[in-house]
Amino acid sequence: GQIPIIKTIENVLEECFERNLISDATICKNENQSKSLWSIREAAAESEKKELEKSNLIKCLKHDISLPVESIDDFHKDAQNMISNFLPELRTIYFGHLGDGNLHYNIFGNGSLPDGFKGESQNLTNKLYEIVHKYNGSFSAEHGIGQLKKNNLKTHKNNVAYSLMKIIKNQLDPKGIMNPGKVLF
């Protein structure tokens, strides 16, 4: 017969634990537990943000990146090193879907500066994306490319991936009628 989904999840988590990929896990048994876990996630980011506001770190560069799970720790060390060399007072908060490598990687800058990053926010973002690329990640994960990131597409995607995206877009929408005026290529 079929194995219930909870048993499948337990088996996967047990294997991850045995391989030292995780140290703990929780499976929600009902909607109240699920809501409780979500509130912890949301409260943690909000709490950290309030602490940063006390130091006037209120400008935020938000990034939606993905990485191979096994690279997250090394990526974060490299990113923190780059960020502290860039502007030592910057701080990061990252959270998200660690199990599949999708991260909301937010960098907070000084609220006294026009953009919070000494006018270097795009340069900082490019440096971060270079580190993402080093670890075979993507500068855009679950939220897609969109208008804000379209200029990063050719720079931060390898040529094969970029070409495949163009081919797929042209095959699915040869007349350019889906999302007109927003074509990325």
Residue map of PLM features:
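Alpha-helix capping/hinge segments and adjacent helical runs
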Residues: 133-145, 170, 174-178
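Activity-critical C-terminal alpha-helical subdomain
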Residues: 149-185
